[in-house]
Amino acid sequence: MVKNQIFSLKSLWSSSIFKILYCYLFTSLLLILSTWVSVNDGLSVREHIILLRLYFDTNGTTWYHNQGWKEYADCILAADGSVRKALESIDPLTGQIPQYLWADHFSQLDNNKTLYKIIHNQIQGHKVVICNAFGITCEDRINLTGIDLSNNNLKGNITPYLPYLLHLRNLNLSNNHLSGCFPDGLLKAQSLVALDLSYNNISCTLSLADSKAISYIDISHNHLTGYFKNVWKTPNLLFLDLSFNKLYGTILKEFFRQKSLDYVNLSSNQLIGFLPILSKSRISYLNISNNRLIGNITLLTCWKAGSLRIFDAENNMFEGALPESIFDHSPLQYVNLKGNIVKDPLPSILDCAKSEVKIIVPDGLKQNKCDPKVSSNWVLILNPLGEEFNIVGSDFGINSKSINIQFQNGLHCVDNVTTIIKSNTIISCKNPQGRNSTYLKLTIPTGEPGNFTVIKQQLYYYRPIIKSCSKVYKNIGGEITILGSHLESFNKTSNGKKMITVSIGNIKNSFTNVTSSINSDGFSGEVISCRNADIITPDMITCSIPSNTNLQQPAEIQIIIDGITAYVPIDSTRPHFLYKGVYNKDITISKPTEYNQTITISVPNETIIDMDQVVRVLIDDNDDSICKNIQHINKTSIQCLPYSETCGSNVKVTLVTKYGEPQFTTSLNYPPPIITRVTQGIDSTSNSIITINGKFLKTGGKRNLSIKINDTICCPLYNEYYYKQDELDDDNNNNNNNNNNSTTDINNNNNIIKNNNLIKEEQILCYYQINQSLPIHLNLPVTLTLSNQTVVKNNIYSQTNSTCPNNCVKHRTNGCRSGICECYPNLTGPSCDENIPESTISNFSNYLPDFILSFPKFITNNTFNIKFLSISEVNESGNIVDRFCSLNNNNNNNNNNNNKNNNNNNNDSNNEKEVVEDEEEDLDYSSQNDNNNINNNNNENNNENKLNWKLINQTKTTNALYTLKIKKKNVTLDILISSDNNQHREVYFAGEVIQVPKSSIELIVNLKGKWLFKDPKNQLKFNFLVKPVNDHDYSLCLPSPFVLISDEPFRWITMDVDSSTIFAKPSNRFLLNNYLVRVIEPNYKLSDSNLTLNLYYQFNQTTLKQQDNHGDDNSDNSIKYTEDSLKFRIDFSTFNSRREINPKPRGCFKDNTHKFPYDYYIVFFGCASGLILVLVICIVQCSRIESRQRKQIIKSFKATQKMPVEIKTPLLPPSFHFNFLDYNNMDLNNNNNNNNNNNNNNNNNNNNNNNNNNNNNNNNNFNDGSDTFNNNNKKNLNYEDNCDTVGFDGKENDIKNINNKKDEKEDDGDDDDDEDDDEYEDDTQPCSSGNSSRSKGSDGGSSSNSLSSDKQSFNNGNENNSIIPENKKKHLTIINKK
């Protein structure tokens, strides 16, 4: 029992404890919440002070609507003098606080809890709510979010502190009389969303906009000046109006790149320059009127802005004609070009669209009238199933709703919808289904209200087309499927079936143009009608063939739908009906040793198959894959040539006879694939394209190819052919190239190469995707499976010595074969020696300066041919005045002209054809002015105008010097070609250091003598030809070059062909009579066939130093000459560029990795130098800003009294520095500052001076006698009988009461301290009403900071200084004073 009572008491006690704890926690939570609510119930101190500043700065008493503002201002100012001080501290007129300290100042205000309580208590006591005042919007009465005082008669300067309202989202002060400068930082406020200061008198410059929140800015109709700032970091800005200001400068393209910008008004300013690109902007309203912008009206990009609706450019300096495509891309509704120079006539589209678009142009311009027409050479062919079709013409207007299209049968476009694809020229609609219309009518408005033009246009429909037919067994029959297009019937018979008939047989005449049905008289032999013909889909028809038919093979197919005979192709793809074949093991086929080789098909005897009856041989049972050129040897054998893509093993061959079932075998076998080498090795850092070279790699267009590298699948891409030259001795090759050029005949049209030293080789490309989790090995096997034939190439990357793998790894490439290390890099330009392959130069011609650049054999066989074509004199218009061309000469010079005119130059016909095809104008040895008389000139005169090149000083196969004499101009032209470069090096030419890559070709052109110009304004032009001589079979896609010119400082010209790149780099300077002259950048031009590149180097009189003809008194002074020597340099080099996957149509691939060459060291050095320069600039700028701030602080707070001589007191504590921003340490309850420490009496000579003589270190100087200070120190002290004048200079902007601070803190709640304060106030002798004493430093530098709360008192009777404890200072002071 006792135990139970004890247990119950314990339980009661424990429950009571929990209840007490629970009540305690709940009470604490309530207190915390109430404290938080009381503290945050109201605006912050900064918001109150800035609102008061706004009210007083704009003369709030004169506002039209100031409900709640006057009561609010009077209530707060009546609270305490500290509020007025805080308000005066940010008075713009006095400027006590510098601008760069405003942010810190407002932060101190927000942290001043005493000032917040004073304002909060005063507002709650008078029940004043500023959030209810006119124009104020608050969020839960805590944050100020909106100020709208528009049209309210605000006068005076705009408050500069508005950017420091941290929660302000909307500010509207428009239509007032505000003046002053635009508040700095207002457009940087991160909370501001909408700003409207329009229709005021605000001046100065516009601050930088850097805010992610702002979306609306209207500062129009003010007096803003300065440069228009284009850097607007406002990604969400929608509306911007800066019109009617005084902004000047240009509009940069970055300004319109803001994605959200929709409305822009920059009218009535002083902007100059061009209108930036607007094609990618989303602006719908753009007003730039009354500025000084310039540009070509035709080329303005605003016509291509996809969202622009309003465009006002009145009173600018635009010039040009309005384009016909003005409405192609922009939905314009208003265009104003008045006050510009608009050329006439105006396009007709303006007349057609004047009812939809308002266009204002200068008066008196001619206008082309709107005359809708359909293009005469346009044929309208419709899909009977109904689909979108286009009508091409002119003057269709821009409003598709006003265009009506009606067909012959009375129907309109589907859904009666007409669309304008291209304004004024192309309209589109969807035709209804059927074939029962022969024309349509277009009704188009002419621009005048109520006037329309009706156009009748004939139309056609697509005929049904037969593409293929399935097979059935002869004796069994069955259902066949016929595939095609437009196989749809729209008419029905009386019994409700579709009107379709299918007939199969041998037809006497072709019925490809038959428009009506035919009877059995049109056939020969047996003719059947396919039963139960039905249209399954518009592309498929099915019908049934009866059994035991005996159709002659191959049989024709005839389909008639709605009385229209289906079209059957008449070429080799013509579809036929054939019976299904049966397997015959007795058929034998010879085994070909090469592709495209004739095969022999045989049977043991004619009873099995009579070979004379074979009419067709099918490969792979495909009607399109037939064996061509069938030759009947006898009744048991035939020969034929399989179609070009036949390859693989166990190929099916079907023999079709006139009558009887086709029979087939699968005994056609080509040799298995052979892998000779694998190039384009695996990259260890990214995916790669692997090239497999070999023989019998043809896939035949079938998906029967599988490639694996080790165990990873390499995705097959495509295969192609190229010609690989046998590995012959280099010397023999060079001799063959130089001595017997006629052995090689390249026909670019037929892709045929005739050379005994060239054999055919095949390639297969595959995409290898690396596995990051697996290491890269150099010794990987390749497994290739093609048409059930598998070949494995083990150790494809095997090495025979240690040097090879080291080099391969070093160069980040893989590949060695036959004991030869193949380290082939994937290059993007010349960078260093080890990454540059060894290109070779060959094929020097004896007749003209040319050479061939080629890659190493293991990379590619692509080559480039560079030739010097001509030297010309052209006039200002670019027309050729004199030209001397490099054509191949015959050994018999007397027959040169005849051979040229007849195009029968036998020795070098190929080169001559290349030059004639690549040059855009007819080439001639002589001047064009002499063309009319060339046939009348004798041989001597003809020889005088020819370029008879001579090849001299050819000591090596890689060097050649060409020279010629142009007798007519009395000049000599030398061209030096050299490729003897074994390393990447720098050469010095024409005062310039040129980077020359390894294995490059140097070409130096030297014109010696004085070139006689026919006109001093003419120019001298050198022409070079760059042509790819590729050995690939480009039947799939042509090797179209891609040309680019790099930026400074490299100035490379690149020409990409397939996987190869040639780099051409001219020197930046040239030598003119040993004087350095800046060269003009070369230009280029692709030929019409896009296969060759013409490089031009042109020199005019601004670069060529010219002089009069000396020594000839009778010479024409207008004729000028070049100097004695003109020399310039060009460097060529070839590189293999890395392949990447970028599919193009027809299976072609484009390499997008070509980059311009650069030197990594130069780039790195440039970046490092730039970074160091930026750091130095930042350090200097920061030092300047810090120095400027320090000077401003010193200037802002000048001391008004010099300091006395310091008395060093080692026992004193460190000095306390006064922070004028710290309002927490000020005594805000004492406005008169109780001058208890300033009771100096001139009659008392033994008075202690420790309370008045404070130095800069806050040390209290004690004077034990009357003669302590010398005369100089006495002069520095300004003692007066009246304490009102002691150290007071009358300036209101100085720091007040710095000697009279209290000892206790503001938040101390000690009652004893309050009593002590009362006693202290009663015993002190204050100065006259509210004036506070100030102490002036002895040096006039800084104000003394001796605070009464920090003051050190000393014992008068003791010579040793003793520090009084803080809690007894005031009591001791009171006792001493008493």
Curated annotation (Swiss-Prot):
Residues 915-924, 1305-1324 have a biased composition (Acidic residues). It comes from the Eukaryota. It is a multi-pass membrane protein. Residues 1289-1304 have a biased composition (Basic and acidic residues). Residues 891-945, 1227-1378 are annotated as: Disordered. Residues 1354-1364 have a biased composition (Polar residues). Residues 891-909, 929-945, 1227-1276, 1328-1353 have a biased composition (Low complexity). Residues 1368-1378 have a biased composition (Basic residues). GO terms for cellular component: cytoplasm; membrane. It is found in: Membrane. LRR repeats lie at residues 143-165, 167-188, 191-212, 213-235, 236-257, 260-281, 282-304, 307-329, 331-353. PROSITE patterns: LRR. Gene3D superfamilies: Ribonuclease Inhibitor. Keywords: Coiled coil, Glycoprotein, Leucine-rich repeat, Membrane, Repeat, Transmembrane, Transmembrane helix. Glycans are attached at residues 59, 112, 143, 172, 201, 265, 287, 296, 416, 436, 451, 491, 513, 596, 605, 634, 704, 710, 740-741, 771, 788, 801, 826, 843, 861, 875, 907, 953, 970, 1090, 1100, 1331, 1360. Residues 886-946 form a coiled coil. The chain crosses the membrane at residues 17-37, 1160-1180. The keyword Zinc-finger does not apply. This is S-cell enriched with leucine-rich repeat-containing protein slrA. It comes from Dictyostelium discoideum (Social amoeba).
